[in-house]
């Protein structure tokens, strides 16, 4: 019975969003259902039925018969539109895709993105990532859904706080897959001797970040911003640390991670004392998180499988991936592991290049 109720609640949330009902209800006070029905063009009787079901979940309520008012929960969907975007993605995309997982499995001859549950649900050969690029609304909703699911904001900043940056003196740090300068600006304020190179894969983003005014001229002097395309060979060869953080919204695949590792192989080979810090969201190993946190992580993992036919990596799989990167002179090896103090799903690996001893 609870599952049936959740199904109807999701359908009602989609209905409210589709007809922009929530925006017609004042954040304070109430409004007559008839007025809302007139504004949105929906039948008043259906509106009342939807509101009364949602009220059982604390979303909207009737202070008096025929009157509609917001609760704290429903009001948040008006003041923070990303919540509504997330709800619409859940109802319009995530739910129907999940229901087509069995059909997709029956039809799959391989795990190409074009054979995903998403492609079955919407009868398309276009991969989900490509659809997000073309359709701004879908991309916005997916980003909002990812943030609400705890996807977009990982624990990498906390992880980096565990490192002994002061021991590096006036060394150069490269943030090689940056989405913004936020992390580097924070580190630059804390460690006034360090120098930074921020590499972004979008020329417009580079220009935008370059126009941001640092808090001091000293920080500006110690920070360079440059463009670097995904998987392009690392050209900065004299850094002490390379930070490799891949975007978390569309979580990186093993292929993407491997390509970035190989792109940094030459830089670490040229400087054996340099360290590459690989930070990426991971699927927690069974039983390492509390049940609610593990459930959220596994919901995200299954949603990713259904949308893209990609899955999250566990820590052991990530280490195996790193250990497989090599050239004729040596290979990568993991020299340290960092864990978030409150999330086994976030980790960072310290990686160095190990030369192969030459035969006498």
From Swiss-Prot:
Extent of the signal sequence: none
Protein name, as recorded: Transcriptional coactivator MYCFIDRAFT_190109
GO molecular function, one term: DNA binding
InterPro entries found in the cross-reference section: SAM-dependent_MTases_sf (IPR029063), WH-like_DNA-bd_sf (IPR036388), WH_DNA-bd_sf (IPR036390)
Function statement: Transcriptional coactivator; part of the gene cluster that mediates the biosynthesis of an emodin derivative that may be involved in black Sigatoka disease of banana. With MYCFIDRAFT_198930, coregulates the production of the PKS8-1 cluster product.
One term under GO cellular component: nucleus
DNA-binding region of this protein: 33-52
Induction, as annotated: Expression is up-regulated during banana leaves infection.
Assigned keywords, A-Z: DNA-binding, Nucleus, Transcription, Transcription regulation
Main localization of the protein described in the UniProt heading: nucleus
Ranges where the HTH iclR-type domain occurs: 3-67
PANTHER family with a match to the protein in the record: MONODICTYPHENONE CLUSTER TRANSCRIPTIONAL COACTIVATOR MDPA (PTHR43712:SF15), PUTATIVE (AFU_ORTHOLOGUE AFUA_4G14580)-RELATED (PTHR43712)
SUPFAM superfamilies documented for this protein: Winged helix' DNA-binding domain (SSF46785)
Localization per record: Nucleus
């Amino acid at each position: 019975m609870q599952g049936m109720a959740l199904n109807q609640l999701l359908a009602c949330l989609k209905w409210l969003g589709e007809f922009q009902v929530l925006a017609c209800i004042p954040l304070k006070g109430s409004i007559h259902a008839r007025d809302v029905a007139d504004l949105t063009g929906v039948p008043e009787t259906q509106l009342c039925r939807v509101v009364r079901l949602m009220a059982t979940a604390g979303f909207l309520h009737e202070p008096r018969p025929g009157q509609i008012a917001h609760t704290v929960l429903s009001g948040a969907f008006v003041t923070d539109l990303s919540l509504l975007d997330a709800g619409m993605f859940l109802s319009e995309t995530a739910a129907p895709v999940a229901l087509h997982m069995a059909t997709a499995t029956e039809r799959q001859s391989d795990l190409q993105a074009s054979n995903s549950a998403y492609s079955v649900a919407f009868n398309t050969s276009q991969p989900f990532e490509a659809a997000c690029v073309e359709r701004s609304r879908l991309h916005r909703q997916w980003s909002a859904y990812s943030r609400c699911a705890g996807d977009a904001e990982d624990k990498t900043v906390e992880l980096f706080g565990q490192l002994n940056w002061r021991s590096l003196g006036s060394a150069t740090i490269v943030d090689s897959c940056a989405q913004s300068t936020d992390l580097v600006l924070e580190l630059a304020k804390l460690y006034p001797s360090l120098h930074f190179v921020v590499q972004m894969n979008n020329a417009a983003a580079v220009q935008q970040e370059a126009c941001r005014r640092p808090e001091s001229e000293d920080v500006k002097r110690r920070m360079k911003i440059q463009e670097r395309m995904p998987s392009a060979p690392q050209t900065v060869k004299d850094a002490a640390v390379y930070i490799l953080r891949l975007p978390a919204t569309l979580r990186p695949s093993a292929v993407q991670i491997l390509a970035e590792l190989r792109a940094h192989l030459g830089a670490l080979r040229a400087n054996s004392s340099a360290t590459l810090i690989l930070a990426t969201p991971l699927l927690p190993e069974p039983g390492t998180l509390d049940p609610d946190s593990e459930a959220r992580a596994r919901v995200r993992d299954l949603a990713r499988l259904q949308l893209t036919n990609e899955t999250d990596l566990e820590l052991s799989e990530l280490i195996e991936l790193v250990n497989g990167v090599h050239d004729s002179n040596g290979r990568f090896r993991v020299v340290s592991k960092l864990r978030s103090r409150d999330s086994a799903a976030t980790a960072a690996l310290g990686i160095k290049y190990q030369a192969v001893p030459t035969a006498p």
